[in-house]
UniProtKB/Swiss-Prot annotation:
GO terms for biological process: regulation of DNA-templated transcription. The keyword Transmembrane does not apply. This is Probable antitoxin MazE2. InterPro entries: CopG (IPR002145). Pfam families: RHH_1. Forms a complex with cognate toxin MazF2. Antitoxin component of a type II toxin-antitoxin (TA) system. It comes from the Bacteria. Keywords: Toxin-antitoxin system.
Length: 81
């Protein structure tokens, strides 16, 4: 559980948005916090990738993943019928 002080204007804006979205203020603030933390984590991921890009071995795995299925099995969709 978190508890913090905020400017009256910010509280009024949060209340207005919560009413507009038909959700509770706590849900609005939880979602906003979760989104902000995800954005911060993404920024760290970008920085880590910039400082240490993927190796050739790691890129080879991505190429394998792009191969897809070896054969087209679409004609087997009705095989059990």
């Amino acid at each position: 559980m978190l508890s913090f002080r905020a400017d009256d204007h910010d509280v009024d804006l949060a209340d207005a948005w919560a009413r507009r979205l038909h959700i509770g203020r706590s849900e609005l603030l939880r979602d906003a916090l979760r989104r902000h933390l995800a954005a911060l984590a993404a920024d760290q991921d970008v920085q880590a990738y910039t400082e240490r890009p993927l190796t050739d071995d790691e890129n080879a795995l991505a190429e394998i993943a792009d191969w897809g299925p070896a054969e087209d099995w679409a004609d087997w969709a009705d095989a059990a019928r």
